[in-house]
């Protein structure tokens, strides 16, 4: 009911699995429904935002990604597999994850599920290094 209300008032965005700069953007498909609880367009000076993410598909490709800000994820429904440099872990409903802006990770879903998370993004500008790495081997740091 809350998600339908947020959609009705213009607080829903369908996020594709790759952006317009990707060489295969023409193959893009819905990856996540994002619902904005506070700001649809957060000002850079504001220290946080609160969103609901309904995941529709695994992270794109074989790579890992990070975020431009530290963040907290609380899994509300479903669950997913998260790959970190320390291994692959099942994240069940109720899991609370704290991530730095530099934390490379990957999310994969169980087939037929649409996990729902509360996502709290922190201040911008704290990431050092690249946005994503494709084909990374966490153990050797080689492609």
Where are these regions (language model features)?
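Beta-strand-enriched cores of mature, soluble protein domains
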Residues: 68-70, 107, 133-141
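Short acidic-glycine-tyrosine-enriched beta hairpin
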Residues: 83-106
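A short hydrophobic beta-strand segment most commonly corresponding to one strand
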Residues: 98, 112-129
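A glycine-rich, hydrophobic/aromatic-adjacent loop/helix-cap motif
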Residues: 18-25, 123, 135-142
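Short, conserved beta-strand element in jelly-roll/cupin
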Residues: 66-81
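A short, N-terminal "cap"/entry segment at the start of jelly-roll beta-barrel domains
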Residues: 1-49
């Amino acid at each position: 009911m809350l998600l339908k209300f947020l959609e009705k008032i213009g607080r829903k965005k369908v996020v594709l699995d790759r952006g317009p700069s990707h060489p295969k953007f023409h193959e893009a498909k819905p990856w996540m429904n994002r619902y904005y609880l506070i700001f649809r367009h957060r000002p850079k000076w504001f220290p946080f935002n609160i969103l609901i993410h309904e995941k529709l598909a695994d992270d794109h490709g074989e790579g890992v990604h990070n975020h431009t800000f530290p963040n907290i994820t609380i899994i509300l429904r479903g669950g997913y597999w998260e790959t970190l440099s320390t291994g692959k872990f099942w994240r069940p409903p109720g899991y609370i994850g704290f991530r730095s802006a530099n934390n490379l990770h990957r999310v994969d879903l169980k087939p037929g599920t649409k996990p729902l998370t509360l996502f709290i993004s922190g201040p911008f500008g704290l990431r050092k290094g690249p946005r994503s790495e494709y084909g990374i081997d966490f153990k050797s740091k080689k492609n």
